[in-house]
């Protein structure tokens, strides 16, 4: 997994309510909608204007199968600036893992992505493991905002994080 740096400003366009699939659940007042290639989180507390509601975050996803297990790969996560720092991303990842099956990290992660997986490991509601060379290894959260594996360096190898 590689470390990457991303831009700091995100202004996501409002979501058109008719185009969204059925919600899989809520995180506070935010509804989570899962499609084949995207997870969209919409703020339900705001008044809809012209059939649109503010988008809190979007996660690009893809479905892969490894050793007979179907994973949803959580790729690029974009968060609207107005909702940053509220801890919504880790809660959305937990909800998606519980409702749709195991999730997996992408091949590269920004600082924010590493922080999300660290929060998942710290909360302990999901089992977070590192998949490296076909073997699952335990990981632990660190005070540096990223998870660490016991036997190898997680971010300098081709390892992927998995949660279920």
Outline where the language-model segments fall.
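Non-catalytic substrate-recognition and accessory regions of acyl/acetyltransferase enzymes
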Residues: 1-84, 90-164
């Amino acid at each position: 997994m590689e470390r990457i740096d991303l831009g700091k400003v995100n202004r996501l366009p409002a979501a058109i309510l008719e185009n969204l699939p059925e919600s899989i659940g809520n995180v506070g007042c935010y509804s989570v909608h899962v499609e084949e290639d995207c997870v969209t989180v919409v703020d339900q507390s705001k008044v809809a204007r012209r059939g649109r509601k503010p988008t809190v975050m979007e996660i690009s996803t893809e479905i892969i199968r490894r050793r007979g297990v179907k994973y949803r790969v959580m790729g690029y996560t974009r968060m609207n600036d107005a909702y940053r720092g509220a801890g919504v991303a880790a809660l959305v990842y937990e909800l998606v893992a519980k409702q749709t099956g195991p999730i997996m990290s992408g091949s590269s992660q920004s600082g924010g992505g590493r922080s999300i997986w660290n929060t998942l490991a710290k909360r302990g509601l999901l089992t977070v493991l590192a998949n490296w060379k076909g073997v699952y290894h335990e990981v632990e959260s660190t005070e540096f905002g990223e998870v660490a594996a016991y036997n190898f360096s997680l971010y300098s190898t081709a390892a992927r994080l998995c949660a279920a």
